[in-house]
Amino acid sequence: MARRRRAEVRPLQPDLVYQDVLVSAMINKIMRDGKKNLASRIFYGACRLVQERTGQEPLKVFKQAFDNVKPRVEVRSRRVGGSTYQVPVEPTERRKQSLALRWMLSAVEGRPERTAIERLAGEMMDAAQGRGGAIKKKDDVERMAEANRAYAHYRW
């Protein structure tokens, strides 16, 4: 495996409605079995719902929610001697983005609303206000990092 090259990161195309790369990433994350049309209908439907319920710009709400969910620190396992330590590290910007999108989607799946559009809209509005499942996940990860701050010197 050591002879393989690192996969190059291909730039994402901005979405057609908001001309935003982050929206494209979210749509791609929502997509299952290559059904991008369905994924974009879900996302844009949720944006419409956010617009109706809050009267705010949906892209602004989404970005606010995304920024609130992005983790500042995370823990990574590091084996030293015979024991494994949870070492707090700051994730790269790319990893922060992928974790935030992943956590938002897993929180959406656990919500009680009927349709995917309503669940996504609800999670976006909640996360923008600093509550909801995705924010709870972020807080748990950051709390874990804070608890293991003593092992920060094992950073690599």
UniProtKB/Swiss-Prot annotation:
| Keyword Transcription regulation set for record | no
One GO BP annotation of this record: translation
Q: Which InterPro entries match?
A: Ribosomal_uS7, Ribosomal_uS7_bac/org-type, Ribosomal_uS7_CS, Ribosomal_uS7_dom, Ribosomal_uS7_dom_sf
Q: In terms of domain of life, where is this protein from?
A: Bacteria
Q: Which Gene3D superfamilies match?
A: Ribosomal protein S7 domain
Gene Ontology molecular function: rRNA binding; structural constituent of ribosome; tRNA binding
Q: Which UniProt keywords apply?
A: Ribonucleoprotein, Ribosomal protein, RNA-binding, rRNA-binding, tRNA-binding
Q: Pfam families in the record, alphabetically?
A: Ribosomal_S7
Please give an example of a GO cellular component term from this record.
Answer: small ribosomal subunit
Q: What protein family does this chain belong to?
A: Belongs to the universal ribosomal protein uS7 family.
Q: What the protein does? A: One of the primary rRNA binding proteins, it binds directly to 16S rRNA where it nucleates assembly of the head domain of the 30S subunit. Is located at the subunit interface close to the decoding center, probably blocks exit of the E-site tRNA.
Q: Subunit structure, briefly?
A: Part of the 30S ribosomal subunit. Contacts proteins S9 and S11.
* Protein's name according to its UniProt entry: Small ribosomal subunit protein uS7
- Organism, scientific name: Deinococcus geothermalis (strain DSM 11300 / CIP 105573 / AG-3a)
